[in-house]
Swiss-Prot record:
Homodimer. Part of the ribosomal stalk of the 50S ribosomal subunit. Forms a multimeric L10(L12)X complex, where L10 forms an elongated spine to which 2 to 4 L12 dimers bind in a sequential fashion. Binds GTP-bound translation factors. Pfam families: Ribosomal_L12 (PF00542), Ribosomal_L12_N (PF16320). InterPro entries: Ribosomal_bL12 (IPR000206), Ribosomal_bL12_C (IPR013823), Ribosomal_bL12_C/ClpS-like (IPR014719), Ribosomal_bL12_oligo (IPR008932), Ribosomal_bL12_oligo_N_sf (IPR036235). GO terms for molecular function: mRNA binding; structural constituent of ribosome. Belongs to the bacterial ribosomal protein bL12 family. One of its GO terms (biological process) is translation. Forms part of the ribosomal stalk which helps the ribosome interact with GTP-bound translation factors. Is thus essential for accurate translation. It comes from the Bacteria. The keyword Manganese does not apply. This is Large ribosomal subunit protein bL12. GO terms for cellular component: cytosolic large ribosomal subunit. PANTHER family: 39S RIBOSOMAL PROTEIN L12, LARGE RIBOSOMAL SUBUNIT PROTEIN BL12M.
Amino acid sequence: MANHEQIIEAIKEMSVLELNDLVKAIEEEFGVTAAAPVAVAGAAGGADAAAEKTEFDVELTSAGSSKIKVVKAVKEATGLGLKDAKELVDGAPKVIKEALPKEEAEKLKEQLEEVGATVEIK
């Protein structure tokens, strides 16, 4: 088994694309994400905090089998260019839109699910 120095040296020699592939492989193997944890301030109301939530994030968890349709739907919903929309879909799970009112978030979720995507509202 390789020691820590050998692993670090191997990583230093990798290209950005190789490092990206390595991160994805580690995420899949261990069921983790490379996203930095977000600190959440505690709500004063406890159970009332859930009832008071007015803004929701729409997260694409999977593009499903109709990736092209999902890319088009994401492009349309976000106003991104085709390349950026494709990168966002390829990088799923990713937040598509943030801080939406509940009705808009549910509408976007419905639109994306109609084209085969798996979506969560958070």
